[in-house]
């Protein structure tokens, strides 16, 4: 049956579904590398889903049907990953013919989108131990870790429930851009692209500065403590239009996903 092409698995166990339903999209990507997760259409977020389908991102008749190329089996350095995403974002922008200013913002956002992973707790999670003296990672390798083990490892590393590395990344850029005297229009757009790179933050982040920290505390206080994040979302919507910002966000996400799928 053509409708079953690429189906990697179906989950119907209520307990397992409840555990999976609370995960963020990037956590599901880590749990099921090379696969797309499909939930029941129109499901109520307040109710547990009835099923979940795991569909292979690479269809069996795809020319690139090499599953090993779609999963991470080795560690990826943070600096290398950010550089690769920045370059890919620039390539996409150039190929589409985007104007120079938003194209430059896309590349800059790619270079900063995962900087928040420098958080010592997150590095402890990725290294599965003390990261002291080691280069920062973007990907830990060995992504077949069971769901329960992933959640325990996050807690053991000291990460608060719901902590978002992309908000820390946005704060890091906001802080540096202010120091460098970057113009507000460009600074706003890059910060927005970085902060929304996993689909959150439109228009709010469910964080207070303490939970979002501890790094870049002043920037986080300004962004989520004083409401500057909501203001820059409104400013970028006015400047670039809601569809324009959504388009740029999608391009950055495409750059990140394709690089990750290539194991970079």
Model-found features: residue ranges?
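Acidic/His-rich, divalent-metal-binding segments that scaffold phosphate/diphosphate chemistry
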Residues: 1-154
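Divalent metal-dependent catalytic cores for phosphoryl transfer on phosphate-bearing substrates
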Residues: 69, 75, 97-264
